[in-house]
Structure formats: C-alpha cells, structure tokens
Amino acid sequence: MPTTATVDPLALDRQVCFALVTTARRVVSVYGPVLEPLGLTHPQYLVMLALWEHSPRRLRDLAEALSLEPATLSPLLKRLEAAGLIERRRDPDDDRALAVSLTAAGVALRERALAVPGQIMERLGIGIPEVERARDALNAILAATQEPAR
C-alpha cells in the first residue's frame, strides 16, 4: 500500500483508460436529448456527420472513416434508411461494393443539426477553446495508438 508521500501508479483516477471511458460515456449521454428532436441516436449522428462531409460513400470507406466494422455499421444504415435519411445502392463503378448516399431528407436534416455542437458545449458548460484543446489531446492519444510499438 503506498504511503501518502508517494503516488500510486495504479490508482484508478490516474489511469488514462478510465478517464477516456468514463468521459466518453458521459459526453455521449449529453448528446441524447439534443439529438432526440432530430430523430437520431449518437451513432446515427456520427454516420450522418460522415455523410454530410462526403456523399455518396462506399460502405467500406464509411466504416473506415467511423472506425467501425462494416457489420457494425450495417444495422445503423438500415435504421437510417428506414427513416428516409439515406439510401444504399450498388456502386455503379463496382457491382460488388455498396454505396451509401444521403436522400433529400438527409441533406435537409443537416440544417437542423447545425445547432447541435453549440447545444452540446452549452450543456457541458465549456467553450470552444477548451473543446478544441481536449479534442487535440485525444487525437494525439489516438495517433499514438496507431504508431508501431516502440
């Protein structure tokens, strides 16, 4: 047992993994009530963000952009398609590939979604500079996990 003069490297509150998991869980829960009026869950919102950046997209490319397996992405797409926000079709350039594109309703939803980031920051009680610093720190951790082990 460590003394009060030493710092326990195994203390739960010192673990980056614990901070990431608990923060992610809580931040995602803040999105729920903000996204509900749009008819979206947080995972569906992420899909829509990726498609608002670039549509149409091949399923494989969309899954990669979201860091998801295509099998995990497929049920999300099915629900978005049932809601009339996207459509899935065979890629005209490659019959084996599936292309995902926004419908007119999906494009129109973007206008309403523009308010989401501001509402989230308001609910979190932090400003743009803090959010940008946190995002940059998280992206640095993400990049470090993608580098070869030293």
Region roles according to the model:
Residues 33, 37, 53, 79, ...:
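Conserved amphipathic alpha-helical interaction elements at protein-protein interfaces in regulatory
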Residues 123-125, 145-150:
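Amphipathic alpha-helical linker/stalk segments
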Residues 18, 25-69, 150:
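N-terminal helix-turn-helix DNA-binding core of bacterial DNA-binding proteins
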Residues 28, 56, 78-136:
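Charged, amphipathic alpha-helical coiled-coil/dimerization segments
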Residues 1-38, 132-133, 140-145:
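N-terminal leader segment of winged-helix/HTH proteins
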Residues 8-9, 51-52, 96-97:
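Short secondary-structure capping/turn micro-motifs that flank functional sites
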